[in-house]
């Protein structure tokens, strides 16, 4: 199953909340929905800044995870650090002109395996991943060894998937794809943006409101 172990990004929610839900459910053992995670991020995160920047930060994630009674943090490290720490981590990547959050699962035989909330279980070769990994940043949740779940552990089906579907299919190579294809990829991972209601005639004037838009945003 291409989306095995992944909280799939559907119903127009952000990649950040989907990636965090995937990590929490797959490594900690929670049973959260993406909406529950998003509500938690809004409640315990920096709500005004979330509205202003229209996205969730690693600090928002840290605060929500802390509210669940867990320690976590965002770090910078080398590729070797990501591999040797031997646990799943949220990592920001930038590919095909877009930025995105995915969950690092494992490194094996020169390939990096990730759980992508929009595209499923996919992989990159080592150098390609290094090229698209944003600022060498990773977000980790500290879980006692005896409590760690292995729902994100690499399985044979993940290895077969790489052979059955090339990376080109997901627009992860430096090729110029037709605009309609890029639109299709973007539409596949749409999200909602949190704004303030500026309609003075609305009973919710001045309160947070959701506007629908795409998840991916062009970096240039």
Residue ranges: model-predicted function:
Residues 107-220:
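Noncatalytic regulatory segments and standalone regulatory/sensor domains
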């Amino acid at each position: 199953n291409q989306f095995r172990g992944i909280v799939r990004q559907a119903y127009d929610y952000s990649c950040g909340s989907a990636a965090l839900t995937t990590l929490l459910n797959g490594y900690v053992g929670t049973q959260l929905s993406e909406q529950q995670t998003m509500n938690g991020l809004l409640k315990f995160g920096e709500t005004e800044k979330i509205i202003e920047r229209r996205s969730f930060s690693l600090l928002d994630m840290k605060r929500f995870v802390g509210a669940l009674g867990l320690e976590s943090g965002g770090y910078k490290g080398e590729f070797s650090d990501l591999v040797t720490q031997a646990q799943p981590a949220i990592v920001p990547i930038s590919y095909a002109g877009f930025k995105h959050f995915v969950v690092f699962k494992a490194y094996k035989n020169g390939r990096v395996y990730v759980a992508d909330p929009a595209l499923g279980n996919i992989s990159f070769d080592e150098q390609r991943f290094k090229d698209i990994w944003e600022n060498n940043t990773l977000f980790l949740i500290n879980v006692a060894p005896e409590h760690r779940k292995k729902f994100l552990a690499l399985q044979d089906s993940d290895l077969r998937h790489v052979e059955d579907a090339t990376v080109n299919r997901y627009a992860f190579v430096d090729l110029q794809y037709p605009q309609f294809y890029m639109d299709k990829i973007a539409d596949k991972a749409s999200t909602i943006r949190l704004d303030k209601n500026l309609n003075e005639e609305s009973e919710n004037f001045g309160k947070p409101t959701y506007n629908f838009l795409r998840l991916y945003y062009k970096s240039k």
